């Protein structure tokens, strides 16, 4: 039996190896004799449950041209694609959701509120793109060799 320096407590194996009495140094941590020899148990907290925010519901809309897009059900605005203005509305979407077949409704009529022409009947308004040129533009040809910068000029620009 080994006592501490003050002679008040019996030292355990761990305290003998450390060379000091933990009960004398830290009396607030020890209530009884058994607590000095046992190690405290560490309890793990359960992981905090976090819920991911709900994603906004979207509907897939397949256009007659073969293109598809996803539109939010709360979006009442439309968009123009290949010259045709497409507008999707919530009642159409809810009616489509009740049925299994997506092609039950006729195509919606588009109202432009008198702002301009209706482009519903025009199917192809795409214009051919100009051919790409291989040479340099005329402006650079007129300037000549003003764009040749020497290595010493580059160093002065970088500094």
Swiss-Prot record:
Domain-level remarks: The zinc finger is involved in PTGS suppression.
* Role of this protein: Acts as a suppressor of RNA-mediated gene silencing, also known as post-transcriptional gene silencing (PTGS), a mechanism of plant viral defense that limits the accumulation of viral RNAs. Suppresses the host RNA silencing by inhibiting adenosine kinase 2 (ADK2), a kinase involved in a general methylation pathway. Also suppresses the host basal defense by interacting with and inhibiting SNF1 kinase, a key regulator of cell metabolism implicated in innate antiviral defense. Determines pathogenicity.
Query: Can you name this protein?
Result: Protein C2
Q: Which residues cross the membrane?
A: none
Record flagged with keyword Zinc-finger: yes
Protein species of origin: Tomato pseudo-curly top virus (TPCTV)
Bias-annotated ranges (Low complexity): 110-124
Q: Where in or outside the cell is it found?
A: Host cytoplasm
Q: Which UniProt keywords apply?
A: Host cytoplasm, Host-virus interaction, Inhibition of host innate immune response by virus, Metal-binding, Suppressor of RNA silencing, Viral immunoevasion, Zinc, Zinc-finger
Query: What are the record's GO terms for cellular component?
Result: host cell cytoplasm; viral capsid
Give the boundaries of each unnamed zinc finger: 65-81
């Amino acid at each position: 039996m080994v006592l501490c320096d003050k002679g008040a407590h019996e030292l355990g194996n761990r305290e003998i190896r450390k060379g000091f009495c933990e009960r004398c140094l830290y009396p607030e941590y020890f209530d009884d004799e058994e607590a000095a020899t046992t190690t405290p148990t560490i309890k793990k907290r359960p992981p905090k449950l976090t819920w991911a925010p709900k994603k906004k519901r979207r509907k897939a809309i397949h256009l007659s041209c073969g293109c598809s897009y996803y539109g939010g059900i709360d979006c009442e605005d439309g968009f123009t694609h290949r010259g045709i203005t497409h507008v999707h509305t919530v009642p159409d979407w809810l009616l489509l959701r009740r049925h299994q077949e997506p092609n039950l409704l006729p195509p919606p009529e588009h109202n432009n509120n008198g702002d301009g022409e209706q482009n519903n009947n025009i199917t192809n308004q795409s214009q051919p793109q100009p051919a790409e040129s291989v040479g340099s533009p005329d402006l650079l040809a007129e300037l000549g060799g003003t764009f040749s910068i020497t290595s010493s000029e580059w160093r002065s620009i970088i500094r």
